[in-house]
Amino acid sequence: MTLIHMNILMAFSMSLMGLLMYRSHLMSALLCLEGMMLSLFVLAALTILSSHFTLANMMPIILLVFAACEAAIGLALLVMVSNTYGTDYVQNLNLLQC
């Protein structure tokens, strides 16, 4: 495993640890999810480039599309929760209150 792959896996694991530790605020959880998606994108792009697997060239682009959709839905949820409750606590996202 090369140093680049180790750094990408370290970035993914740091984002995952951030998501597990700082899960009280929705904004920090969204930032950690974006870090995870970015590291997955770079890992997928490097893996496809190094293996010369031409059939999977669209996989990083599709991953970016899903990351953009996740970011848009997350920001819409953040705005809705902030307008309703005044804070961005994840505790306010109880599905039984809807």
From Swiss-Prot:
One of its GO terms (biological process) is ATP synthesis coupled electron transport. It catalyses: a ubiquinone + NADH + 5 H(+)(in) = a ubiquinol + NAD(+) + 4 H(+)(out). Keywords: Electron transport, Membrane, Mitochondrion, Mitochondrion inner membrane, NAD, Respiratory chain, Translocase, Transmembrane, Transmembrane helix, Transport, Ubiquinone. Core subunit of the mitochondrial membrane respiratory chain NADH dehydrogenase (Complex I) which catalyzes electron transfer from NADH through the respiratory chain, using ubiquinone as an electron acceptor. Part of the enzyme membrane arm which is embedded in the lipid bilayer and involved in proton translocation. This is NADH-ubiquinone oxidoreductase chain 4L. InterPro entries: NADH_UbQ_OxRdtase_chain4L/K, NUOK/Mnh_C1-like. Core subunit of respiratory chain NADH dehydrogenase (Complex I) which is composed of 45 different subunits. It comes from the Eukaryota. Its EC number is 7.1.1.2. Belongs to the complex I subunit 4L family. Gene3D superfamilies: 1.10.287.3510. The chain crosses the membrane at residues 1-21, 29-49, 61-81. It is an enzyme of class 7 (translocase). It is found in: Mitochondrion inner membrane. It is a multi-pass membrane protein. GO terms for cellular component: mitochondrial inner membrane; respiratory chain complex I. GO terms for molecular function: NADH dehydrogenase (ubiquinone) activity. Its main location: mitochondrion.
